A protein has these predicted regions:
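Structural motif corresponding to the intra-repeat A-B loop/turn of tetratricopeptide repeats
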Residues: 24, 58, 93, 126-127, ...
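Residue-level recognition of tetratricopeptide repeat
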Residues: 19, 53, 88, 121-122, ...
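TPR-repeat structural position
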Residues: 27, 61, 96, 129-130, ...
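Short coil turns that delineate tetratricopeptide repeat
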Residues: 42, 76-77, 110-111, 143-144
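Conserved structural position within tetratricopeptide repeats
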Residues: 36-39, 70-73, 107-108, 140-141
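Start-of-helix register in tetratricopeptide repeats
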Residues: 5-12, 46, 80-81, 114-115, ...
Length: 196
């Protein structure tokens, strides 16, 4: 267990160096440190998040897709953090439909992911309002949560009986306030919590 902890900490150290190098647009140093992080801990999702950002910055979109996609095998929970970037890497190659389908596939495989907003926004661009709305509704119904219900109410309010509209609007604003309060990041390793 201690060996694992050290590997995790070493990988995080290299990720910090890579993130700093990326911020300074020193992409060679960033890439080197990402590789060191992955050498220390091959399950380091953060390293692939940074690698995807490096590849995107260099215009190497197929490699960005590969880096972001590798997160599924490392820790699928982090896919929520790269959903939009993954789609944009597909889009830069003219493969918007493929990118959208991959995000939908992730939601169907891992219903706990928070990708509903990205999927809805991208489907809206590609398929139009009614198809995007139906897609969002179907995905929310698979595993309802506050974020999904908030989105669902937003989609349904315009079709509602006027007598219900005010109540539905009030429910949506209560859910929205609760969502703002509950957006927390929790580290699975050290249990650190932070408002995102």
């Amino acid at each position: 267990h201690d060996e694992q902890t050290y590997q995790f900490e070493i990988a995080q150290f290299y990720c910090e160096l890579a993130q700093t190098a990326l911020f300074k647009s020193n992409l060679d140093a960033a890439r080197y440190n990402v590789q060191k992080a992955l050498d220390a801990n091959k399950k380091c999702a953060r390293a692939n998040m940074i690698l995807g950002d490096i590849e995107t910055k260099q215009g190497n979109f197929p490699a960005a897709v590969e880096a972001y996609g590798a997160i599924e095998q490392q820790n699928h929970a982090y896919l929520s953090m790269v959903g939009e970037k993954l789609y944009e890497a597909y889009s830069a190659q003219g493969k918007q439909e493929e990118g959208l389908n991959r995000l939908i596939g992730y939601m169907q495989t891992f219903p706990d992911l928070d990708l509903i907003n990205v999927i809805y926004e991208k489907a809206l661009l590609l398929k139009g309002e009614s198809e995007a709305a139906q897609l969002a509704i179907d995905l929310v119904r698979q595993k309802p949560d506050l974020n999904g219900v908030y989105r669902l109410l937003g989609l349904k309010i315009s079709d509602m009986n006027p007598a219900w509209k005010a109540d539905a609007d009030m429910m949506r604003s209560v859910i929205g306030r609760q969502l703002q309060r509950s957006v927390m990041y929790r580290c699975r390793n050290c249990h650190f919590k932070s408002q995102v």
